[in-house]
């Protein structure tokens, strides 16, 4: 797949993409606590799509909005329709005097985990040992759980979304609020990664809650180039403490 769509010398990309992961959610906290104590599941009693932000997550969104409003005026905003991303978007835009239109975009929603939703590695091994083996054999990038998605599945829908940006939002400044896997998939597509590059960056560090990733259009190459990745300097006071 390629995302470098060009018609002659005319710019077809937005001037910049600012991609933000949602703030800390109730699900994030439950998952981290389950990992610490070795639990097999981290249920919250809510569907993934309905999971809200924590108070810390709301504060992260507020601080992110204060930071972005001092550096950008956006022409358009796209948010995953999940509750935690919508709340993050609302928290960010509260800092803006001029609020651009917000589009709830299903193509940038969270990866679908299928039957493994809400399970830790220990839980998968206990409840679905054959899936645990298949997951190890196929690898994190290609593995598709029953009823769920692989990373390439997510890439297909994000690639379609990028096509919309090149068609309708050229020369615009665009804010995108989404999820950690989707942030990495944007990088995989825009920087033309293969599996090895994706896994390498994924292993190096987690995409932080409310971190900012920025691409800017380069006139010489006619492409969006990475300006910064996973930047969370504006969140020093609101980062969750390491266990």
What are these regions (language model features)?
Residues 14-17, 86, 160-223:
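Active-site-adjacent alpha-helix immediately C-terminal to a catalytic or transition-state-stabilizing loop
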Residues 38-43, 102, 129-138:
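A short C-terminal helix-loop "cap" of Rossmann-like NAD(P)-dependent dehydrogenase/epimerase domains
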Residues 22-23, 79-83, 107, 147, ...:
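Short, well-ordered beta-to-alpha junction loops that form the rim of enzyme active sites
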């Amino acid at each position: 797949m390629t995302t470098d769509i060009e018609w002659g010398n005319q710019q077809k990309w937005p001037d910049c993409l600012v991609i933000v992961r949602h703030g800390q959610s109730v699900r994030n906290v439950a998952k981290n606590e389950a990992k610490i104590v070795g639990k097999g599941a981290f249920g919250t009693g809510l569907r993934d799509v309905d999971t809200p932000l924590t108070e810390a997550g709301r504060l992260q969104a507020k601080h992110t909005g204060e930071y972005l409003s001092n550096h950008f005026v956006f022409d358009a905003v796209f948010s995953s329709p999940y509750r935690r991303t919508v709340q993050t978007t609302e928290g960010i835009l509260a800092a803006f005097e001029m609020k651009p239109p917000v589009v709830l975009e299903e193509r940038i929603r969270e990866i679908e985990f299928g039957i493994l939703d809400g399970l830790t590695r220990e839980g998968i091994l206990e409840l679905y040992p054959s899936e645990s083996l298949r997951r190890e054999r196929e690898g994190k990038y290609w593995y598709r759980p029953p009823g769920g998605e692989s990373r390439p599945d997510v890439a297909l829908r994000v690639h379609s979304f990028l096509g919309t940006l090149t068609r309708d939002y050229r020369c615009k400044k665009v804010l995108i609020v989404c999820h950690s896997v989707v942030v990495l998939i944007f990088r995989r597509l825009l920087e033309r990664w293969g599996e090895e590059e994706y896994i390498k960056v994924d292993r190096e560090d987690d995409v932080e809650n409310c971190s900012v990733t920025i691409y800017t259009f380069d006139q010489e190459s006619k492409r969006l180039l990475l300006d910064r990745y996973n930047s969370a300097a504006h969140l020093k006071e609101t980062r969750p403490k390491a266990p």
